[in-house]
Amino acid sequence: EFVLHYQPIVDLLSKVIGKKVTYQYSDNWLSYSKDMTEGSYDIVFDGPAFNGWRIEKLSHTPIVRLPEDFVFVVITKADNDRVKQVKDLAGRKICAHAPPNLGTLTMLSQFDNPARQPVIIETKGWDNSYKAMLDGKCAATVVPIKNLTKNDAGTKKLTKTLYQHKAMPNQAISVGPRIAPELHKKIAQALLTEEGKQATSKLRSAYAGKDFVPATRDEYAGMGDLLKSSLYYR
């Protein structure tokens, strides 16, 4: 499945760069993080925290990104009187994806003391996390604001928001220092053409993404800080 998403992009980039580009699949976060932080990858597509980290540590340059921003909210049930602010979640259960999921990282960024953090009840899927929180399996959850708007659309709100993280740029493709600077613009332009849109269509549809737009280093500056407590990124 992943090869189907990436192979058309690999073929296009091989043509643009003039060298064979190969797709390297990693089946888990640990091996991906280890290889990525060691600088094994020259072209990477992933989230803003990783892009920010690579800009700072590996001299990567983001070239195109998905257009919509990420906004995450930490929510609890509207009638939960024991939790009034996000800090009250220290030591309590939170239904969330396993870190380094971006939503989970934004929530954890509000807890500086490693000994005073929420307990993550690993839950896959935003809707599942939301439902588990309403069912009382955890005190709170973190979801994209669009997901909250969809699920809590009634006049009588079922939830209250404890924290809203600042908007962040979406997933991006970055290129590393082994790719000549004069090729960066060429690659970006190729990905934005009609041929590029065709090549990236399967990948973008997997993320409900519209057409790529140009990306800049400034947009992702400082985003790597979200990974400060994650293995391999310290």
Give the positions of each predicted feature.
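Extracytoplasmic small-molecule ligand-binding "clamshell" domains
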Residues: 1-49
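Bilobed "Venus flytrap"/periplasmic-binding protein-like clamshell domains
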Residues: 1-15, 49, 71-131, 135, ...
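Stable alpha-helical elements in mature extracytoplasmic
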Residues: 5-9, 28, 32, 40, ...
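Short helix-initiation/N-cap motifs at beta->coil->alpha
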Residues: 23-34, 119-131, 167-169
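Beta->alpha turn/N-cap motifs
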Residues: 25-29, 39-52, 66, 100, ...
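A ligand-binding cleft/hinge motif common to bilobed small-molecule-binding domains
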Residues: 45-57, 108, 132-159, 167
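A structural signal for short loop-to-beta-strand junctions that line the ligand-binding cleft
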Residues: 57-67, 162
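Periplasmic-binding protein-like
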Residues: 68-76, 154-195, 201-230
